Amino acid sequence: MLAMSSTQIAAFTPDQAAKLTTSQIAALNKQQLQALKPEALAQMSTTQIASLSATQVANLKMEQADALTEPQVLALGNKVVNLYVSPLILDLNRDGKFSVSVDNGVKFDIKSSGSLLKTAWVNSTDGLLVRDLNGNGLIDSGSELFGDHTKLPNGKLAVNGFAALSSLDGNRDGIINSKDTQWKDLKIWIDRNSDGHTDPGELASLADMGVTSLKLNVKSSTAVENGNKIGLVSSYTMVDGSTGVLADVWFRTKSVNAPEVKTVGTLDHITHTDLPPGS
């Protein structure tokens, strides 16, 4: 542990924080890390930021995470899942695009905390895979999406959208379809006006949309789209036998009052040729 108190670390200027070694950063405990000013974190190099452990990233306060630049976020690699939320999205128009940036997104209780967050969001022509758990005709929070805030039968939260969906695979055949008991409960939410609210006509059953199955065999993706990561991809099948991409998209989130952060990075388009074998 760095031999300094949290009070001393809180007094660091951005220039002083930029001089910390990677070993010193890796040694910061939770209290020390959270004492760093957001502007001090933002001044660190991508090498310094990459030295943070997954646990340290998870311990960042919201205002600290908000201050990270896009190059810093990308430098975190797979540890960024601790800064993101991961709903499943069906690429309904099959254009290889899924989402808009957090600054062009919505306010939604995506972490099921009872509080709204600014979050990246699904494109208006694609669909979120959802369940109306409380039967009110609305999708109220991240608990009704399929992602890392989906509660599993054992009471724990899923690690990603496909892990959440896998819990419904009653016959363990790697496919979610009409043979699975909860198939009838699955719906697609197309937020056509991109407002984060479930408006009349935006919720439809999989059958109404012509979807006959969802495959659980996934492969990892390194694509970045509007500051969001396309983490895992699989496929869905339509009644005519055609297929589309089902993706676990890791949305960037920010506190409601956070300033706009410009995003960088390009999307390596996900196409039908990117699907796992057997899709």
Model-derived regions, located:
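Calcium-binding acidic motifs and repeat modules
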Residues: V80-S279
